[in-house]
Structures are given as C-alpha cells and as structure tokens.
C-alpha cells in the first residue's frame, strides 16, 4: 500500500490546510495512508525583513517544490496566494480546492472599520498590496510591516501598540478565529492577492497516479478563476510580494475578473475589469494584464522593484 507523503510548511495554519487536503483524499482514496512532512521555507526562516525586501519569488514554496522534484514528498500543499506565476516545468498544479472567503479583513483594538479608525492610526500588514490599498483609501494611516504566523501577527496589536492588523479572512476562518474579525475589506475597494483563499495541490508531472487522485478533488470553478488570475500575474511578471492583486468570479458561463496594480504608497492605483466566456479563462487573464500594461502597470512595478533593490543594496 502506497504512503502518500505530503509536504507542508510547519505553521499551524499550513498544517490545518494540509489536513483539509488529506481528509478530501481519504474520502475518495481510503486505501492509501497519508503522512505530513514539515518543510521550513526561506520565508519562514527570515523574519526580520519584509517579504519584498528578501527578494525573489516563491519565498514560501521553493523548498517544498524542491523536495517534490527530488521525490522526497509526493504532494505539495500551497496557499495559492504564495505561488509565483511561474512553476517548475517538471511539476504541475493537479488540483485547486474550493475557494474560502477571498477577502482581506481588519482586526482592530476597538472593533472599528477602516473608515472609523482615527486619523494617524497605525496598522500592521505583511504585504505591499495591502499597504498600498490602505494608503490609497486612507492616506493619513501609517502602515508598518509585521511578520510571523497568524497568532504572532494578531498578538502584535498589543505587543507593538498597533491600532489593528490586516490578515486574510480564509486563514482566520480555517483556524476557527472568525470572531476576531472587526470588518471585511470588500473586494470592490480592496483587491485580494492572486489565488487568495484557495489551496493548491502540486505533484510531479510524471506521477500519473497522484495526478489522477488530485483530479478527483479539484474544484473546477475555482481552478478556472485562479488560473485566470495566475495568467494575469505571469504576464505582469509579478511576484507575491509586490502591490498586485486579481480576483476572478464565475457568474453563469461568464468569468468576471478584476486586476489591480499600485505603487507602494498607494498614490497610483490602476484597476481594470474584464468579462467573457469562462471557457477562455486563460485568455481573459492575459487580456486583463495587457490592459493594465497599456495603462502603465509595468512602470509602476519596475519602480517598486527598483526601490526594493536599492533597500537591499543599502542593507547589505
């Protein structure tokens, strides 16, 4: 009997997510045994720098992908929002599970919404995408970088005297911490990260047995939407750690998709929408990316990347 070795980050949230996938597989394939292999990624090891300052793409996935390619594990579980646009040729995303709530949320001391926070409030965030959109909506708010797992970031409201922090709704829901949420940042105003709320299952291209198993747990609607978002991301050559977001939603036989690129300070925000036949999901993602490029998205992202390179040079 085959034991399926599943690679996961070691955080509480990552392990909960791995168990979600294992339970889905067990229901369909009870004849196998399943084992979680904990893997520490570069993003987990370096906690004294913001993600955009570490540089590179795939900070939370590369080591897991390496273990998969080297056949130390059979299956890699990722938060889709951590996945760079490019994946290694020998690996394939065999399944994307049904999306959890894709929204970002605000957790504040006094249960206030973003609009209700006082002038000059200090918010903690781990991403430039969130920082840029907060500053675009509330230029008077100060956004400070915070790192660590969900519990650590929640704790920083007290330990670092923050007025609040921004996290993903999906992670809090999966950890049973929904009651912590003060307010939801609605998608119309606050574009999520590419793939936010969805889990991805990656296997070796040559492992036909594993890929057939993954097909049984794939959520086709979420798969199409997220792959459209990833086509957008790939065209813009954006990593997970630049101010870029996209969200696709199937409505009937149509895909409705929003894409956003912003400067780090939120002073420039380009946001566009596209809709079309869901069967053309990849092409729609590319079309949306091309529209943003025509409006100056590449120049904005290059400025962000240049700023990060300067900071990295000064810090070395």
From Swiss-Prot:
Cofactor annotation: dipyrromethane
CDD domains: PBP2_EcHMBS_like
Protein name, as recorded: Porphobilinogen deaminase
Keywords of this entry: Porphyrin biosynthesis, Transferase
Cofactor note: Binds 1 dipyrromethane group covalently.
Family: Belongs to the HMBS family.
InterPro entries on file: HemC (IPR000860), Porphobilin_deaminase_cofac_BS (IPR022419), Porphobilin_deaminase_N (IPR022417), Porphobilinogen_deaminase_C (IPR022418), Porphobilinogen_deaminase_C_sf (IPR036803)
GO biological process, one term: protoporphyrinogen IX biosynthetic process
Molecular function as annotated in GO: hydroxymethylbilane synthase activity
GO cellular component, one term: cytoplasm
Positions bearing S-(dipyrrolylmethanemethyl)cysteine: 240
EC number: 2.5.1.61
Pathway assigned in UniProt: Porphyrin-containing compound metabolism; protoporphyrin-IX biosynthesis; coproporphyrinogen-III from 5-aminolevulinate: step 2/4
Source taxon at top rank: Bacteria
Reaction equation(s) it catalyzes: 4 porphobilinogen + H2O = hydroxymethylbilane + 4 NH4(+)
Source organism (scientific name): Alkaliphilus metalliredigens (strain QYMF)
Biological function: Tetrapolymerization of the monopyrrole PBG into the hydroxymethylbilane pre-uroporphyrinogen in several discrete steps.
Assembly and oligomerization: Monomer.
Note: The porphobilinogen subunits are added to the dipyrromethane group.
HAMAP family hit by this protein: Porphobil_deam
One Pfam entry name: Porphobil_deam
């Amino acid at each position: 009997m085959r034991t399926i070795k599943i690679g996961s980050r070691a955080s509480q949230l990552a392990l909960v997510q791995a168990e979600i996938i294992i339970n889905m597989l067990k229901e369909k394939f009870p004849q196998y045994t399943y084992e979680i292999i904990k893997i520490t990624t570069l993003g987990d090891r370096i906690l004294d720098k913001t993600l955009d300052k570490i540089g590179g793409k795939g900070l939370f996935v590369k080591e897991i992908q390496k273990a998969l390619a080297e056949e130390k594990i059979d299956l890699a579980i990722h938060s889709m929002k951590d996945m760079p646009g490019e994946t290694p040729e020998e690996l394939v995303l065999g399944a994307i599970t049904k999306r959890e709530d894709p929204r970002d949320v605000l957790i504040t001391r006094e249960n206030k919404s973003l609009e209700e926070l006082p002038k000059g409030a200090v918010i903690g965030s781990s991403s430039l995408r969130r920082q840029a959109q907060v500053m675009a909506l509330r230029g008077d708010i100060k956004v400070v970088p915070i790192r660590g797992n969900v519990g650590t970031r929640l704790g920083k409201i007290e330990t670092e005297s923050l007025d609040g922090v921004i996290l993903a709704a999906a992670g809090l829901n999966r950890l049973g911490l929904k009651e912590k949420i003060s307010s939801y940042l609605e998608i119309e105003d606050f574009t999520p990260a590419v793939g936010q709320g969805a889990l991805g299952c990656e296997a070796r291209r040559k492992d036909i047995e594993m890929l057939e198993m993954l097909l049984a747990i794939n959520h086709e609607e979420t798969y199409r939407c997220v792959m459209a978002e990833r086509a957008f991301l790939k065209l813009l050559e954006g990593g997970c750690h630049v101010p870029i977001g996209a969200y696709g939603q199937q409505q009937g036989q149509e895909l409705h998709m929003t894409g956003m690129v912003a400067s780090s300070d939120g002073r420039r925000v380009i946001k566009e929408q596209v809709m079309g036949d869901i069967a053309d999901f990849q092409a729609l993602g590319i079309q949306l990316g091309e529209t943003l490029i025509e409006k100056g998205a590449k120049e904005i992202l290059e400025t962000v990347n240049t700023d990060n390179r300067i900071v990295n040079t000064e810090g070395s």
